[in-house]
């Protein structure tokens, strides 16, 4: 539906619009669509962005996923205060908290001030409908929705407990204390809810990066492989942190056409046959077609290692499937480029493909189980399965082998070369190998 001034005009004109940000165009962000079984409708959740965190997430409905969509109502607001600048009376905050409630904490970026954008709506394993949302500063939160309306479930209440929950925003899942973090997304697989977050800024040198945490409950707590909480209790620059499993870093190796940087703001999908796909956008150190900030959408398959953590295929998805019965010794053995996705650095120099870029080491997986080359150690595999374990310089990584096409076409090639790869995680750090 191209009539977005009519669809979103009510919230935009009444709450989000300011003299410094007067146009709705360019202020509609990050839609998320889900089929609501109770309503029998496709529900789109859209961020309507205003200045100074003065934003609202609204819901639209349609009978077809392609639309046309109709306005359903607001779900959650941010940026409100008790004064005249962003009047709370224009929101539902007093309906939730009660008339005269103290709103002081919602104006503190180290406390609960966040931007109500970037919704992800999902069902838990018990059939309850939830929305995870938020951006930077105050953190990422989770609200229960009413399946009958697709909007906030006003019958569900929350306590205000520092670093755990807020009476208006719901359960606190991640972030806080002014750290970066946006684009939350949750999927469920084999007993765990996986929370994806993007740290940093989305420009090429902004340190954009995807981090993963998991929990046995959709409401948390979410932790990384090392047991670190996704919630921050003190202020720090989390672009250089080892908190959260960084699914991939900025990297350059022979299997890619360009140097990948600033990957982020992903969604993810678990197919009916149990395969997992991650959709995200990437920028490039060299730019693309003369555009420094050019970006493209990518899809990469994810796998669950033996410890129950997600690891990403080294190359973009082109229809290949992992061998559930594994691979033979000749396919697995040989020389590999090996990249460690160090979580504490990122690309920071336009046009220079060496600053903050992960470069490969060269290793050889030998038939006797040893690893030789620039790094040394050992490796094993699970008979009848793609699962593998590799120990290098004292760090043990677990993951899978996968035979797939690389992303680089060499001179006179019409098809990408199919190569053996592996993707692993160990000591809270991901790594890839490509033969």
Q: Which sequence ranges carry the predicted segments?
A:
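Carbohydrate-active catalytic/glycan-binding domains of CAZyme proteins
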Residues: 1-435
